[in-house]
Amino acid sequence: MNTNTKKLVMAALMAALTCVATMMIAIPSPLKGYINLGDCLVLTSGWLLSPVYGFLAAGLGSALADLFAGYILYAPATFLIKGLMALIACFGFRLFHKKCSNLISRIISGATAEIVMILGYFVFEGFMYGFIPSAVNIPANGVQGIAGMIIGIVLMKTIEKSKITRLC
């Protein structure tokens, strides 16, 4: 199969899986968002795909979940925030992988991406609802970020053992 076709198919698959994982378990948070498992696939998109395909898969999959779940106002911000998370995961892994093990590289890049998610939604919700009320969602986003990072790292271990080639 053509390499570009393989990358496109993998990105589409990751976008679909991200959308499903985001919607499958959705626990409403205090403001208008929700806690979900989509971050594990957002990070996996960054670690597995190229920067552009990772950004698009993570951003589109997450934004589609917001649209389908009725969080229409969140969709544009989600597209940017989750896309940036995948970019940070990809570039962070590439940078630290030269000096550290896969596990440490994924922890550093994943934690950095999750901090961007927490800050991104804090700023977005701050403009929508005020910065004091938006601070209420920081702990929920932190829990989601930690869970997403742990599950994403375990998922990547499984992918590496199955000998699926890295496309990044």
Task: Enumerate the language-model features and the residues they cover.
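Loop-helix junctions at membrane interfaces
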Residues: M1-C168
